[in-house]
Curated annotation (Swiss-Prot):
Its main location: membrane. Pathway: Protein modification; protein ubiquitination. The keyword Protein transport applies. Component of the PEX2-PEX10-PEX12 retrotranslocation channel. It is a multi-pass membrane protein. A zinc finger (RING-type) spans 244-283. This is Peroxisome assembly protein 12. Component of a retrotranslocation channel required for peroxisome organization by mediating export of the PEX5 receptor from peroxisomes to the cytosol, thereby promoting PEX5 recycling. The retrotranslocation channel is composed of PEX2, PEX10 and PEX12; each subunit contributing transmembrane segments that coassemble into an open channel that specifically allows the passage of PEX5 through the peroxisomal membrane. PEX12 also regulates PEX5 recycling by activating the E3 ubiquitin-protein ligase activity of PEX10. Residues 45-48, 120-124, 220-297 are cytoplasmic. It comes from Drosophila melanogaster (Fruit fly). The gene is Pex12. GO terms for biological process: peroxisome organization; protein import into peroxisome matrix; protein import into peroxisome matrix, receptor recycling; protein monoubiquitination; protein polyubiquitination.
Amino acid sequence: MAEAANVRQNLQNVPSIFEISASETLDNLIYPALSKIFDYFGLRLDFKLWGSLRIQEELSPLLTWLLQYLYLRKRASSFGESFYGLQRTVTTTGDLLNRRQQFASATLLTFMPYVERKLRTRITRHEDTSPWEQRLLSAFHAFHAAKAAHTFFYLVKYASNHSPIFRLLGLTLRYPSEPPKEDQWTYVVLKMLEVLAFFLQFVQWWYSNDQRRKVGGTLINPEAMPRKQLPKEVQQSLPQRGECPVCLLSIQTPTACSVSGYVFCWKCIVSHMKEHGTCPVTHYPISLDDLVRIYET
């Protein structure tokens, strides 16, 4: 079987789309894996760095970039590509990557998913997005469409690369013609990282199964929260049906507060939450995650 695999690599030096897709999936697991490591070891790194930025959210992409750049420097491939025995080469000459291509590859591998993840998180939380953020998200949609087209042309052997990024950098994926030359220290470190990838996949599987067992074994309704008696002046000022408790007008963009159950205008409840951090009616503490947009049909 090993001899047949070697013959295949010699006769056909082009990896299949399944190997490429698997390597991309493994690359995309680095960021959540680092976040899980921080949580598992109890590293209290989730505090504000500047504005809305949090140090854990910004440290993980930086470590991801360092890991990808290390692999691109030593093996001319990303972490996932090296795991599946692939290598990046120049499309026209077949040479390995130069420093500029290594830096650009590591940057695009890390910060494109980072920016897209940030934008999608803001949209999921129904936060207001600026026009340039909307245009940037549209650009990501166009990129994914272009990547799907490149993948199709790669499948029918009409294109030498599977992604617009590879086409932009003038690169393609191939099986290495010879094993990478690296010192003993580098070999040990990279092998430890590959073993860590197996370990992380096992931990993820074990954790998901453990959570499933816990949820399946304790399907008991939680106790009701103690009812807070509202002051008389608050009870008298409660709005009529269909009115926002804050502006006392007809509700626009209805948004429910999961803590109290009241429905407000989106702008009213967000403005009040940012200023006071509580529900306007019950004065229970709330956060942006407690607000649920209601889409009427």
